Amino acid sequence: MTGNEKRKKKRYARSVRKRQKKREKQVGEYDDIERVIHPDALFDAFHACEKGVAWKASTQKCHYNLLFEISGSYESLSLRKSIQKGFYCFNLMERGKLRDIASVHISERYVQRSLCDNALAPVCTRSILYSNCASIRGAGLKRSEEVLIRQLRRYYRKHGNNGYIVLFDAKSYFDSIPHENIIADIANLFYDPDIIRLYQEFMGAFDSIHPECQKGRGLGLGSQISQISGVMAANPVDHFLAEIFSLGYGNGRFMDDSSVIVKDKASAVLAIKVVDLLYQRYGLALNKKKTKAVPLNHPFIFLKRKVIVRDSGKIIMTVSYTHLRAHE
């Protein structure tokens, strides 16, 4: 090994140690299972969970015996015992689409809430792009609309409305997310094995609501664990489009719906091929019927909003007519 190669190796080792220390400093505050299962944390998590559902009999019963419930949960979690009580499965019509909901019992829900609020969310959202707006505190549909309008304005100042926006849709997004990939991502973010184990237990519980052939895949709607996992599942694809795909001029995501602005039709076709390959790599599937490239000087629909970019640069965003008909 030459002297130059030795210097490069030492420089790389110093860089790795520096990144490791920075990561430990950022994550260290949340990398502690006691922060998640402490009675005070569980107490706060319960009161956050009961908002909007305090009228339910199960919630009132848990509230009436709250100290006893929290004491039992803390003891079980400290001894690494399971606290799972299965799912309540039902259907719900949301934005004109019938969805299968798998809701957890309130006594398990507040533990999941504590895990998400005191560990997963503060750490995982560090790597989430600003344009990824679903299920993140302070984000939401309004910010997603603002991000899209800002990207369109920035593109218009350079190229006018002569371009394309590629609208992606993931096929059966929550039903196809591989558990192995998400668990590996969480294991890379945390050092505490108990946090990883608890998250793995919650993820493994979804196997009980899926057929045998789908074991190890899919999440259930109605769980906060599902929401943070859904946000993380396609995060590598978003980073690729934002940081490596040089033909893009801005991208956004709201769970299974995402977009990227490109300059011409060839770049749009390439973007679809690239995202299709990346989805396959991470165990997801692109809905090729709903995925399409639309010229920016044509109206398009994203997140149930109809968007028009005028030749003058004026951007008009309204609720789509098809969305209104679904609610009639």
Give the location of each predicted region:
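Conserved polymerase palm-domain catalytic core
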Residues: 151-255, 259-278, 294
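Active-site-proximal segment of RNA-dependent polymerases
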Residues: 29-32, 116-168, 172-175
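Reverse-transcriptase-like RNA-dependent polymerase core
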Residues: 76-97, 197-210
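Non-catalytic, polymerase-adjacent accessory regions of viral genome-replication enzymes
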Residues: 1-71
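Conserved small/polar residues in nucleotide/adenosyl-binding loops
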Residues: 322-328
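Conserved catalytic core of two-metal-ion nucleotidyltransferases
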Residues: 282-308
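Conserved pre-motif C helix in the palm subdomain of viral-like polymerases
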Residues: 98-129, 215-243
